[in-house]
Amino acid sequence: MADLNLARLIIGIIGNVISFCLFMSPMPTFVQICKAKSVQDFKPDPYVVTVLNCAMWSFYGMPFVTKNNVLVLTINGFGFFLELFYTGIFLAFSPWGKRRKILLALLAEAIFVALVVFFVLYFVESLKERALIVGLICIFFNILMYFSPLTVIRQVIKDKSVKYMPFCLSLANFCNAVVWTVYACLKWDLFILIPNALGALSGLVQLILYAVFYRSTNWDQESAIEV
């Protein structure tokens, strides 16, 4: 048992490091946005979804919901604030129409998280039931986070171009999902296992597409490709 706990701790630390890289991987994209003072054809969807995902996983990792999940809490707490920062850049450089949609989405997320926290803390007493309720919600939003970059796949296949599908983000998503899948297997936590196993599949699909269409991509083209 001690060896298993040590293995979980080591894998969890590795998972935190890779998750950190995942959260930092879009940074070149936002440097590009800031230099151009425009969001161009990049979409905020993955970042807005990840804000909610990190908020819910941070709540799941708190000791009054689940025990011994401090690694889940710390990395998702960091991710929450970083994704808010990314979303803020989108707000700063988006036209009013897109800005309004982002603000409405963030408002809806804030209301949803507040309602979940209130309901769980005031109406659900046992940790087992709290973990079940919050865990199921986390599964749903974790899957959304991993699959949100796939909104670009149709356009990638149509245009035979991966210009607006960031390789670093796809690779980090894949590695992150694989490590947390291993962590979940050691602990046998289905709430962590299910979304991350699907996330590994999502990341693999993105990497395959990148390999297939990399050579056919015109990196100098200015045509609008939605992400």
For the regions a protein language model found, what residue spans apply to each?
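Alpha-helical membrane-protein topology signature
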Residues: 1-227
